[in-house]
């Protein structure tokens, strides 16, 4: 679920940035998304959005699906491989958290979602 995703983000970036920092970033971080991603971090969010879209096609409610995971050496690790939905959603979130941790964060890309760059 989204709270667990927030925990994974903190795990992967060693607590350097809260998940709230990503809510209104670029064209894809936060609710919805459109246009061309503005940078690598926004591309991570687009990939995560697409992954959630695939989860919804599988009848998994990704925003509300709880799963089991742990933080091992600053890497989120999923434990729910037996449940198709839980495992899929956990993998989406873990991949995005790792992607966020590697991508540069550009403060100039906060709050641009309503601008023409995201049309």
Swiss-Prot record:
Main location: secreted
Positions of the catalytic residues: 48, 93
Matching SUPFAM superfamilies: Phospholipase A2, PLA2
Enzyme class: hydrolase
EC number: 3.1.1.4
One example of a Gene Ontology biological process annotation: lipid catabolic process
Cofactor: Ca(2+)
Top-level taxonomic group: Eukaryota
CC cofactor note: Binds 1 Ca(2+) ion.
UniProt-recorded Gene Ontology molecular function terms: calcium ion binding; phospholipase A2 activity; toxin activity
Catalytic reactions on record: a 1,2-diacyl-sn-glycero-3-phosphocholine + H2O = a 1-acyl-sn-glycero-3-phosphocholine + a fatty acid + H(+)
Annotated S-S bridges: 11-71, 27-118, 29-45, 44-99, 51-92, 60-85, 78-90
Gene3D superfamilies reported in the protein's UniProt record: Phospholipase A2 domain
Tissue specificity as recorded in UniProt: Expressed by the venom gland.
Binding residues annotated for Ca(2+), in chain numbering: 28, 30, 32, 49
Keywords: Calcium, Disulfide bond, Hemostasis impairing toxin, Hydrolase, Lipid degradation, Lipid metabolism, Metal-binding, Platelet aggregation inhibiting toxin, Secreted, Toxin
GO CC annotations on file: extracellular region
Location(s), subcellular: Secreted
Function statement: Snake venom phospholipase A2 (PLA2) that potently inhibits ADP-(IC(50)=10 nM) and collagen-induced (IC(50)=7 nM) platelet aggregation when tested on human whole blood. PLA2 catalyzes the calcium-dependent hydrolysis of the 2-acyl groups in 3-sn-phosphoglycerides.
UniProt record similarity statement: Belongs to the phospholipase A2 family. Group I subfamily. D49 sub-subfamily.
Name recorded for this polypeptide: Basic phospholipase A2 acanthin-1
Organism: Acanthophis antarcticus
């Amino acid at each position: 679920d989204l709270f667990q995703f927030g925990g994974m983000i903190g795990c992967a970036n060693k607590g350097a940035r809260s998940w709230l920092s990503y809510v209104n970033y670029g064209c894809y971080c936060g609710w919805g998304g459109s246009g061309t991603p503005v940078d690598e971090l926004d591309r991570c969010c687009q990939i995560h959005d697409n992954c959630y879209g695939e989860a919804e096609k599988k009848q998994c409610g990704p925003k509300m699906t709880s799963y089991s995971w742990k933080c091992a050496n600053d890497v989120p690790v999923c434990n729910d491989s037996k449940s198709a939905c839980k495992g899929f959603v956990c993998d989406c979130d873990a991949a995005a958290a790792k992607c966020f941790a590697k991508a540069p964060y550009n403060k100039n890309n906060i709050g641009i979602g309503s601008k023409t760059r995201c049309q």
